[in-house]
Design a protein with these regions (language model features):
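A short acidic (Asp/Glu
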Residues: 21-23, 104-112, 144-148, 188-191, ...
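Active-site-facing alpha/beta catalytic cores
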Residues: 1-120, 124-132, 141-142, 173-175
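A generic structural motif
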Residues: 120-137, 161-169, 219-220, 324-325
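Acidic/histidine-rich catalytic neighborhood
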Residues: 225-249, 253-256
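Conserved, mostly hydrophobic/aromatic
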Residues: 4, 135, 224
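Structured alpha-helical segments in the cores of large, soluble enzyme domains
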Residues: 43-48, 70-88, 103-125, 150-178, ...
């Protein structure tokens, strides 16, 4: 109330596919495309064009020429940023976040669009961008590819020029930010596989960034429920991989959790204290304590793969989407106006296009809480039955590993919240008996396997 937004900085976030479409329109307007779209080019062709163009200061088009809706939208945004920097500097501006980053070309395209808008600057050493371009890794595949993408991006001349300018300005090592998505990775492969992929990715990304004389700063895109990455803040900090917290971090707070945590003075003080104290404590451990290798990593690799397979087998069960659309209130959520973003990324009626927010919310409303537990029980039961020695080793590691304690406790809380009677009642809304029984049977078996393992 006293300061409003005066001390805040503004991030700009856009989907990689939107950027690619914008560049395609620019290239076509400049007469640099034949019948083939830039989107259809091979990765090698795209990289060759990007490297060539990023060595040149000239834009594609003269000012005032429209290239297409996506191109005009991105360039208008970047021109506003360039004007702000010209008048006031970079204070108040954050990062250019690229959601659904799949490959390094998704990040280099942003440099080229920034050059076109006059946001990127030409220096004697080449092009540099005054605002950091930040990858957002959201799916399991992208998290696994993340370290390689960041390595290629940080080795690129434009990124090196940009980091060198920051290093000179700060008089020390700059920070390099990476955003990791908890919601979409969970929707992609289930909670256990998602959490393990995030843990491994942050560890590998930290090592990659440190090798380039920069400090890793992770932006944790967490939601307000376990299925979207939520959990006790201090446990979350304790569970972060060693070296991933260097004194600075970011995380999202959802609208509903902001009111819950900070609407009243006493709760605001309590939650702010937990956040700052746990961040300071974890940073001190990461700086001064020696990293402790997790002895059961190979077991967790297999457990994650098993839980992912169980989760995806449910999603690929014949008739699953028909069951989902009838047994949950997803149709009401899609037509509601309560969210800040549309329920689907591009409007396509597919599971891949559905955002994680309505996905988790709909299962919660039907009291399945499926994104918070499905797949974990099946994987643990298989481990216990087929490899009892590994299961015993995992149980022993639970007493020592903050990561395991955090993840399994969150899964347990989701399992306790699920209501089997209400699940059966909602499943009864599905008119096709074959579909209803096939999906309900898969969910019921998973719940039965989960319960004795966790309870």
């Amino acid at each position: 109330q006293a300061f409003g937004f005066h001390s805040a900085s503004l991030d700009v976030r856009q989907n990689s596919a939107f950027h690619e479409k914008a560049l395609d329109q620019l290239l076509r307007a400049a007469g640099l495309l034949d019948e083939r779209s830039f989107i259809d080019w091979s990765v090698e062709e795209k990289r060759a064009l990007l490297d060539r163009e990023l060595r040149s200061p000239r834009p594609f088009l003269s000012p005032g020429i429209s290239a297409g809706p996506e191109a005009d939208t991105v360039l208008a945004c970047h021109r506003v940023l360039a004007a702000h920097i010209h008048d006031f500097g970079t204070s108040g501006l954050g990062s250019l976040i690229v959601s659904m980053t799949r490959r390094v070309e998704d990040l280099l395209i942003v440099y080229l669009l920034a050059r076109e808008a006059g946001l990127a600057e030409w220096t004697p050493k080449g092009l540099r961008c005054p605002l950091p371009v930040v990858p957002l890794f959201e799916t399991m595949g992208d998290l696994e590819a993340g370290p390689g993408i960041v390595e290629a991006f940080m080795s690129h001349p434009v990124t090196q020029n940009s980091l060198a300018a920051l290093r000179e300005k700060l008089g020390g090592d700059p920070s390099f930010q990476v955003m990791v998505g908890y919601s979409d990775s969970n929707k992609d492969c289930g909670i256990f596989a998602s959490q393990w992929a995030l843990h491994r990715a942050q560890k590998a990304l930290s090592e990659t960034i440190t090798q380039h004389a920069a400090k890793p700063v992770f932006f944790h895109g967490r939601g307000g429920t376990v299925g979207r990455g939520a959990g006790p803040t201090h446990w979350f900090m304790d569970a972060l991989p060693h070296g991933s917290l260097s004194g600075s971090m970011r995380m999202t707070e959802q609208g509903e959790t902001i009111a819950q945590k900070y609407a009243h003075f006493s709760s605001a003080v309590y939650n702010a204290e937990i956040l700052m104290a746990s961040a300071a404590s974890a940073t001190a451990r990461h700086r001064h304590a020696k990293p402790q290798a997790l002895a059961v990593e190979h077991i967790l690799d297999g457990l994650a793969a098993s839980s992912r397979d169980a989760y995806r087998s449910l999603l690929h069960t014949e008739g699953f989407m028909a069951f989902y659309r009838t047994a949950t209130p997803i149709d009401a959520l899609e037509n509601s106006r309560i969210g800040s973003r549309p329920s689907r990324r591009t409007g396509q009626a597919s599971l891949d296009d559905l955002r994680a927010i309505p996905w988790v919310f709909s299962w919660t409303q039907a009291r399945f809480y499926l994104p918070g537990w499905f797949g974990a029980g099946s994987a643990l039961k298989s481990l216990r039955d087929e490899r009892p020695a590994d299961y015993k080793a995992l149980a022993g590691a639970l007493r020592e590993s903050a990561f395991l304690k955090y993840v399994l406790t969150n899964i347990e809380s989701s399992l306790v919240s699920a209501n089997a009677n209400l699940m059966r009642a909602y499943a009864g809304l599905v008119p096709d008996e074959t579909v209803r029984e096939a999906v309900r049977a898969a969910g019921g078996v998973a719940l039965e396997r989960c319960t004795p393992v966790f309870m």
